[in-house]
Amino acid sequence: ARLMSLLMLVFSVAPILAPIAGSLVDETAGWRAIFWSIAGLTMVGIVMVAVTLPETRPPAARAAGGLGAALSGYRILLSDRAFLGLMATGACGAASFHAYLAGSSFALINHYHLTPRQYSLAFAVNAMSFILAAQWTARLGLRFGLRSVVRGAALAYAVTMLSLLLLYLAGIDRVELLIAFLLVGYGFLGLVIPATSVLALDAHGARAGTASALIGTGQFVFGACAIAISGRFTDGTARPMVATIAACAALACALAWLSLRDRTGRQPVAPAANRPV
């Protein structure tokens, strides 16, 4: 869980820095320079991987069997209902964040008339709560069990986002309200995604790479669906985005409780203090 929290920290830095950096590039060199910057950073990444990232697994420990072994691993994972439930829980949570990624600029800039710089700061604040909460996943998991953390955080996230949706449906439409609820909600989401990934991988250590690939693919597929649904109902306000986020949060909560309903007690993923991460 500590390792997953660290990975979430690394992966979450980009959503915080990218809008701020993008607004600065746009203001100084125009929007075309953003794409040139992306291309340049991509080339730097390719060179760094080729030059500075050696293979870490010894030859004897590397997976063998080629395509057949890979397909067999996918078959085993896709037949594991517990794995699928946890993967879908995390994917629904990630989908809610993708809906925010896609719709927040239209809502905060076009609807609430924030400047690009103000939008970048608002986005960073909400993403920061996700990162900070993710760093507590391991500690809370050791104290309460990761299954309890997932159930509680998913429920709190759903309640927070559904409350925000009800306020919008009641006609209360304020940017301060949106930012505040997202700040709290994404804190809970920061507990859900790392914990579900750890629980899903726990029983599949021998095929962790395949399982991780499925988890990542599920998050992006669910995210693309959430973006498409939110975009289909765009009306110039923040309501479609908020409704999509709330729906994803509610679905994640339902899946979490269904997937973990028969599993109680402390989480066995990290029963020993000196378990390697």
Labelled PLM ranges:
Residues 150-193:
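C-terminal transmembrane helical hairpin of 12-TM major facilitator-type secondary transporters
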Residues 259-277:
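Intrinsic disorder in cytosolic terminal tails and internal cytosolic loops
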Residues 4-18, 45, 93, 126, ...:
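Structural signature of transmembrane alpha-helices in multi-pass secondary transporters
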Residues 6-51:
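Helix-loop-helix hairpin linking two adjacent transmembrane segments in secondary transporters
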